[in-house]
């Protein structure tokens, strides 16, 4: 039986035993992620174990899609898939071998960095983070790929300060609707706190703007240090979006009343748009506020795209984007969301200072209340 099962796996993949697992650094519905080291070369890697428990008909289709996409995407700001490894099926693993995706190791994820109050980003460093993030989105969108799970935990940063978009487990190729027939993609994607309003309203014919909404949430998070809209349900998330971005109406979002759930959900009425007003206590730079405002536009057709965002004055005004390597060199321990305390509302987090000085005596240490 073991031999039969083994034959449907990856006969040309190396054994994962060539790597020594060092620590678990991630856990999710997708499986587990480990920091590991190549036994011969010493190269550090990340091993993502593909969850096979519920697969009765061989290799999971979602993992096949992720592998295909990662083999297509080769860019400095996209995580690099090195190879695919396996463990052989045997009586010791109930005749079920495991598959591992092997990636270049990145020392941190953005959620882990933001959860650590000792990590201080200057304004110029925030500019560099967002510049690399948008560069990555520009590249994948040019290659007709949607990420569909933009959040701080899926943004990796190496010790040299290079940002990598990661976790393409929900990613897919996209295309323009053909012959007036809309696409029918699933809208059950994107972590709730980063999910754009069009998906919450049931839209299935969507594109790159869904990832740009997540980029806007992440950009605001660079100052608030915690997700800015932490809904408990889809209805609650829409209410939080309305409180920040204004009520969802056909006046601000043409044809939104044609969306499947527009009439079925109780949408908040009478709310004015106040993205800048609500965030200006945290985000002091006017260009930064303006870009966040353009990323968090309700109507996906009017939301700024990655190309225009990269040309925004935020990136072309003083202080200019600067390298992260110097700041990260003072933090020798890896920081990941999985290893950090939860970044939920109610937690007391020090407001992000964008002063160029990192002297604790001169850095603003005032505690802030949540945006919501």
UniProtKB/Swiss-Prot annotation:
Resulting phenotype, residue 48 to R: Decreased acetylation; leading to enhanced protein kinase activity
Gene induction: By replication stress, in chromatin. Probably degraded by the proteasome upon Thr-186 dephosphorylation.
Record localization: Nucleus; Cytoplasm; Nucleus, PML body
Positions of the UniProt region annotated as T-loop: 166-191
Activity control mechanisms: Inhibited by CDKI-71, CR8, GPC-286199, AG-024322, flavopiridol (alvocidib), RBG-286147, anilinopyrimidine 32, arylazopyrazole 31b, indirubin 3'-monoxime, meriolin 3,P276-00, olomoucine II, pyrazolotriazine, meriolin, variolin, thiazolyl-pyrimidine, thiazolyl-pyrimidine, indirubin-30-monoxime, ZK 304709, AG-012986, AT7519, R547, RGB-286638, imidazole pyrimidine, EXEL-3700, EXEL-8647, 5,6-dichloro-1-b-ribofur-anosyl-benzimidazole (DRB), P276-00, roscovitine (seliciclib, CYC202) and SNS-032 (BMS-387032).
Modification Phosphoserine, positions: 175, 347, 353, 357
SMART domains xref list: S_TKc (SM00220)
Misc. comment: CDK9 inhibition contributes to the anticancer activity of most CDK inhibitors under clinical investigation. As a retroviruses target during the hijack of host transcription (e.g. HIV), CDK9 inhibitors might become specific antiretroviral agents. May be a target for cardiac hypertrophy future treatments. May also be a target in anti-inflammatory therapy in innate immunity and systemic inflammation.
Gene Ontology biological process: cell population proliferation; cellular response to cytokine stimulus; DNA repair; negative regulation of protein localization to chromatin; nucleus localization; positive regulation by host of viral transcription; positive regulation of protein localization to chromatin; positive regulation of transcription by RNA polymerase II
SUPFAM superfamilies associated with the record: Protein kinase-like (PK-like)
Entry superkingdom: Eukaryota
PTM annotation: Autophosphorylation at Thr-186, Ser-347, Thr-350, Ser-353, Thr-354 and Ser-357 triggers kinase activity by promoting cyclin and substrate binding (e.g. HIV TAT) upon conformational changes. Thr-186 phosphorylation requires the calcium Ca(2+) signaling pathway, including CaMK1D and calmodulin. This inhibition is relieved by Thr-29 dephosphorylation. However, phosphorylation at Thr-29 is inhibitory within the HIV transcription initiation complex. Phosphorylation at Ser-175 inhibits kinase activity. Can be phosphorylated on either Thr-362 or Thr-363 but not on both simultaneously.
The reaction(s) this protein catalyses: L-seryl-[protein] + ATP = O-phospho-L-seryl-[protein] + ADP + H(+); L-threonyl-[protein] + ATP = O-phospho-L-threonyl-[protein] + ADP + H(+); [DNA-directed RNA polymerase] + ATP = phospho-[DNA-directed RNA polymerase] + ADP + H(+)
Residues involved in ATP binding: 25-33, 48, 104-106, 167
The name this protein goes by in its record: Cyclin-dependent kinase 9
Stated consequence of mutating residue 186 to A: Abrogates autophosphorylation; no effect on kinase activity, but impaired CTD phosphorylation
Assembly: Component of the super elongation complex (SEC), at least composed of EAF1, EAF2, CDK9, MLLT3/AF9, AFF (AFF1 or AFF4), the P-TEFb complex and ELL (ELL, ELL2 or ELL3). Associates with CCNT1/cyclin-T1, CCNT2/cyclin-T2 (isoform A and isoform B) or CCNK/cyclin-K to form active P-TEFb. P-TEFb forms a complex with AFF4/AF5Q31 and is part of the super elongation complex (SEC). Component of a complex which is composed of at least 5 members: HTATSF1/Tat-SF1, P-TEFb complex, RNA pol II, SUPT5H and NCL/nucleolin. (Microbial infection) Interacts with the acidic/proline-rich region of HIV-1 and HIV-2 Tat via T-loop region and is thus required for HIV to hijack host transcription machinery during its replication through cooperative binding to viral TAR RNA.
Pfam families (UniProt xref): Pkinase
Enzyme Commission number(s) of this protein: 2.7.11.22, 2.7.11.23
Entry keyword Kinase: yes
Tissue expression pattern: Ubiquitous.
Task of the protein: Protein kinase involved in the regulation of transcription. Member of the cyclin-dependent kinase pair (CDK9/cyclin-T) complex, also called positive transcription elongation factor b (P-TEFb), which facilitates the transition from abortive to productive elongation by phosphorylating the CTD (C-terminal domain) of the large subunit of RNA polymerase II (RNAP II) POLR2A, SUPT5H and RDBP. This complex is inactive when in the 7SK snRNP complex form. Phosphorylates EP300, MYOD1, RPB1/POLR2A and AR and the negative elongation factors DSIF and NELFE.
Disease cited in the entry: Chronic activation of CDK9 causes cardiac myocyte enlargement leading to cardiac hypertrophy and confers predisposition to heart failure.
Positions bearing Phosphothreonine: 186, 350, 354, 362-363
Composition skew (Polar residues), residue ranges: 347-366
Record GO terms (molecular function): 7SK snRNA binding; ATP binding; chromatin binding; cyclin-dependent protein serine/threonine kinase activity; DNA binding; kinase activity; protein kinase activity; protein kinase binding
